[in-house]
From Swiss-Prot:
<feature type="region of interest" description="Disordered">
    <location>
        <begin position="91"/>
        <end position="112"/>
    </location>
</feature>
<comment type="similarity">
    <text>Belongs to the universal ribosomal protein uL23 family.</text>
</comment>
<keyword id="KW-0699">rRNA-binding</keyword>
<dbReference type="Pfam" id="PF00276">
    <property type="entry name" value="Ribosomal_L23"/>
</dbReference>
<feature type="compositionally biased region" description="Basic and acidic residues">
    <location>
        <begin position="136"/>
        <end position="157"/>
    </location>
</feature>
<dbReference type="GO" id="GO:0019843">
    <property type="term" value="F:rRNA binding"/>
</dbReference>
<keyword id="KW-0694">RNA-binding</keyword>
<dbReference type="GO" id="GO:1990904">
    <property type="term" value="C:ribonucleoprotein complex"/>
</dbReference>
<keyword id="KW-0687">Ribonucleoprotein</keyword>
<feature type="compositionally biased region" description="Polar residues">
    <location>
        <begin position="158"/>
        <end position="167"/>
    </location>
</feature>
<dbReference type="GO" id="GO:0003735">
    <property type="term" value="F:structural constituent of ribosome"/>
</dbReference>
<dbReference type="GO" id="GO:0005840">
    <property type="term" value="C:ribosome"/>
</dbReference>
<comment type="subunit">
    <text>Part of the 50S ribosomal subunit. Contacts protein L29, and trigger factor when it is bound to the ribosome.</text>
</comment>
<dbReference type="InterPro" id="IPR012678">
    <property type="entry name" value="Ribosomal_uL23/eL15/eS24_sf"/>
</dbReference>
<feature type="compositionally biased region" description="Basic and acidic residues">
    <location>
        <begin position="97"/>
        <end position="112"/>
    </location>
</feature>
<keyword id="KW-0689">Ribosomal protein</keyword>
<feature type="region of interest" description="Disordered">
    <location>
        <begin position="136"/>
        <end position="167"/>
    </location>
</feature>
């Protein structure tokens, strides 16, 4: 069996995290594999020394979803104990991640400064626009009052003309 086909993936649960601190790692493995193949595969893939391998089959479990019933699939689980001094890093290397985080923090502060500057510029433009609108509204109100006065004068002139023509 091919080394890459033996290990299907890590099993990451609360219990497996506790076991990792003592050097025991849990993997989902191919149902056709045995202890020696699993040991060779882990040593080859992760470049570590294996002390002990325990393999067992996890049985299928009944699951219910509403009215329907079903089963989870059974799988083979391997608990691999490493020699002292060896560890397997199942996650990304954390040190480059810390550098990325610090870079993103500095980028975020620069972006926040740019955003604050743009907000200030927009507020200044909004104030200018508000002042212009206020001036235009004042001019329109003045024109409206003038037109109202002119209309009143026309109406008065028309009524006077009608009275004069009636006399």
């Amino acid at each position: 069996m091919n080394v890459n086909e033996i290990i299907k993936g890590p099993i990451l649960t609360e219990k497996s995290y506790q076991l990792m601190s003592s050097g025991v790692y849990s993997f989902k493995v191919s149902p056709k594999t045995n202890r020696s193949e699993t040991k060779k595969a882990v040593e080859y893939i992760f470049n570590v020394k294996v002390e002990k391998v325990n393999i067992f089959t996890v049985p299928k479990k009944e699951k219910k979803l509403g009215k329907s019933k079903g089963f989870t699939t059974k799988y083979k689980k391997a608990l691999v104990k490493l020699m002292p001094g060896y560890t397997i890093n199942l996650f990304e290397d954390e040190s480059p991640q810390d550098q990325k985080d610090s870079e993103t923090v500095s980028e975020n502060t620069e972006e926040k400064a740019k955003i604050a500057k743009k907000k200030a510029e927009l507020e200044a433009k909004n104030k200018e626009i508000a002042e212009k609108l206020a001036k235009k509204q004042a001019e329109l109100a003045k024109k409206d009052s003038e037109t109202n006065e002119n209309q009143e004068k026309r109406i008065e002139n028309q009524t006077e003309n009608q009275e004069n023509s009636a006399n």
